[in-house]
Amino acid sequence: GRNSVQFGNLLADEEFGGTEYGGVFFNAAFGQPAFWSANTLNTGPAFNVPALGFRYRRNFTDTWYAQAAVYDGDTFDSAGGDATINQHGTHFELGNGQGWTSLYEFGRNGFNNDDGAGLPGWYRVGAWHHSTSFAKHDGTNGEGNWGLYGIADKMLWREEGGQGLGTFIRLGTAQRDRSRFHWVLDTGLSYTGLLPGRDDDVAGLGFVYAKHAGDITDAVKSHEAVIEATYRIQLT
């Protein structure tokens, strides 16, 4: 259908901010993006801690879509980060200054109508917001934190049977005066069927660069970076 609604204990990273070709990598920075997870309260509703939420999606065509969602602001139900309080995902608590998390995304997913011959792509822009109070780097508090992001996945080379080379790039930001990372970039390449006779194996090379907010670089290094090379073997 054109309209889709979800309500319940949800994982935001399953539907917002993900990448088609970044899923092969093990480092968590290639999953839920660090420009959101590191700059919100207790990482937000993402694997493996869901949150009570509501998501609406409108499919304008087979490829164009828009979606928005709102979630409980603290998946741990603990401002101090005690993960044991909601370790089973059944502790529901709203209020107490937790605020709420919201995400918004608009995009075109060419993989939805891939004809098996062309080079499809998936392009989207989005925003995230958390409403609670955050400590700023100057010692004061600020209401809320938010950021913007853009993501592109593109198949670059196709072989028969779904094999081929694809790439992704993802860039996101957050408010500089109250965030750990001011902006984060991750990108990579993924090749399915690189080796002869191994049509379902996937090889990948990925890179993440996370720029610390300028106000905290006196205490820590200016950035963090990840380089990962991986090879996933299909056994059966």
Predicted regions, residues:
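Short loop/turn motifs that connect adjacent beta-strands in outer-membrane beta-barrel proteins
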Residues: R2, G17, T63, F111-W122, ...
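C-terminal hydrophobic structural anchor segments
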Residues: S179-T236
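Residues that define the transmembrane beta-barrel architecture of outer-membrane proteins
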Residues: N48-L52, Q98-S102, G144-L148, F181-L185, ...
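Extracellular loop and loop/strand-boundary signature of outer-membrane beta-barrel proteins
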Residues: N39-N42, I85-L94, H137-G139, G172-R176, ...
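Surface-exposed coil loops of outer-membrane beta-barrel proteins
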Residues: R2-S102
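Transmembrane beta-barrel strands of outer-membrane/channel proteins
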Residues: V5-N9, A66-D72, Y123-H129, L165-T173, ...
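Surface-exposed beta-loop-beta
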Residues: G73-D153, E159
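Residues on the lipid-exposed face of transmembrane beta-strands in outer-membrane beta-barrel proteins
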Residues: G1, F7, F54-R58, Y104-R108, ...
